[in-house]
């Protein structure tokens, strides 16, 4: 948890610093978002993986506080449902297939910094800040053998790493750092946003004590998303 305090403190100090100068704004915008996730789990010892696809979507609130020279400063909060997980790249000659989908409610809190048009037009933006997640116990775990000749067989896994199979998620609370880059298209009927985002987990889904099989088991996710926002106050 201490690893999260530095970026959180930076976010709060940055917001406080911007609040002391610049042209004040008071713009509240709300809307919804949706997108596509490509996820992996950073395991130690390492498990070879491909990206596990999944969907995400939720609601967005953004409060713009001021314009500092050309920089438009805001705070952004989201509450999203997100599918994550991992898909193993099994290369031990068994032709087995394994993937697991995990579901989370994620709550990112961002410093949102934009450059461009405030009214109608295009604005480029950066989002950065902490993200918290809450695990929903509704996993989908799928594993297959290739044929009767090549059934499901864990015995040949590199390093004998098989403890992830069927293992319950032990830590329901997740935290990490997220950041994104995107473009906002401001129109007369609201704002349309396109964003690419990356999440780096700092917490582990499984226990990480010396007695546990994994020293690290943290989510990492690449997200492509679109959002629609409408101004409530200006």
Could you say what each language-model-derived stretch is?
Residues 1-25, 33, 226-233:
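Bacterial Sec-dependent N-terminal signal peptides
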Residues 20-58, 62, 231-234:
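Short glycine/proline- and aromatic-enriched beta-strand/turn motifs that initiate or cap beta-hairpins
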Residues 20-27, 66-73, 116-123, 186-191, ...:
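Short loop/turn motifs that connect adjacent beta-strands in outer-membrane beta-barrel proteins
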Residues 25, 174, 179-234:
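Predominantly the C-terminal beta-signal and adjacent terminal strand-loop region
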Residues 26-28, 49-55, 101-107, 122, ...:
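Residues that define the transmembrane beta-barrel architecture of outer-membrane proteins
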Residues 32-36, 57-63, 81, 107-115, ...:
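Residues on the lipid-exposed face of transmembrane beta-strands in outer-membrane beta-barrel proteins
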Residues 42-48, 93-99, 164-169, 209-216:
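Extracellular loop and loop/strand-boundary signature of outer-membrane beta-barrel proteins
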Residues 62-141:
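Gram-negative (and chloroplast) outer-membrane scaffold detector with strong preference
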């Amino acid at each position: 948890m201490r690893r999260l305090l530095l970026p959180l403190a930076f976010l709060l100090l940055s917001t406080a610093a911007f609040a002391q100068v610049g042209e004040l704004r008071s713009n509240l915008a709300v809307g919804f978002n949706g997108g596509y996730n490509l996820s992996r789990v950073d395991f130690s010892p390492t498990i070879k993986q491909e990206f596990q696809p999944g969907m995400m979507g939720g609601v967005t609130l953004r409060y713009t506080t001021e314009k500092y020279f050309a920089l438009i400063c805001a705070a952004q909060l989201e509450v999203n449902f997100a599918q994550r997980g991992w898909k193993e790249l099994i290369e031990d000659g068994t032709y087995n297939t394994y993937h697991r989908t995990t579901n989370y409610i994620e709550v990112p809190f961002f410093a949102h910094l934009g450059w461009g048009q405030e009214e109608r037009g295009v604005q480029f933006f950066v989002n950065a800040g902490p993200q918290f997640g809450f695990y929903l116990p509704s996993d989908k775990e799928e594993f297959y053998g290739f044929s009767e000749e090549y059934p499901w067989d864990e015995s040949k896994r590199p390093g004998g790493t098989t403890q992830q199979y069927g293992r319950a998620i032990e830590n329901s609370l997740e935290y990490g750092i997220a950041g994104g880059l995107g473009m906002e298209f401001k129109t007369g009927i609201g704002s349309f946003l396109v964003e690419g985002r990356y999440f780096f987990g700092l917490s582990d889904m499984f226990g990480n004590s010396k007695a546990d099989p994994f020293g690290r088991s943290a989510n990492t996710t690449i997200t492509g998303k679109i959002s629609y926002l409408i101004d409530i106050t200006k």
